[in-house]
């Protein structure tokens, strides 16, 4: 199934047209999916708002890197391999497997503290919270430190990480905490990351539309 934004724009009825099968010249890109028992292949074409006249190959490589980092963060818990069994999700970007990025550095030997999981039953379902303090910069090599900072860096990635059924919805920030003055992302708090799990039954309370 596919959409064509040019076809939608040209349709006088204003309808949202949905097409079956590959667009002309695109079938070869979809061929790898035929060898899989199940899965989803996402193909973006005609990215005229992204690939502009000034766009270079370096810009495109940077974009791919940013997409990979975002996928590794948003789906990291589904991509992680459990002690027994297979990961719930496997992602490939240009035939390259996306490796999960763990914002809490679970298992790092220099991690000073993390709390046990605190669970509370709410009218919308079970909510679980874990607090994590990450290692000091001295515990990392320079590449490790940069990777642990996340896509947006150490200061921007501090705060709450809100998950719905294992998928990350919010990556950092303090969700309006603070009496009279909201907390901001500051250098002094950059080692603090809090994991908050909510169920899909809490969508209305959290105003989630997925």
Show the residue positions of the predicted features.
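Short loop/turn segments at secondary-structure transitions that flank enzyme active sites
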Residues: 7-9, 47-50, 77, 97-99, ...
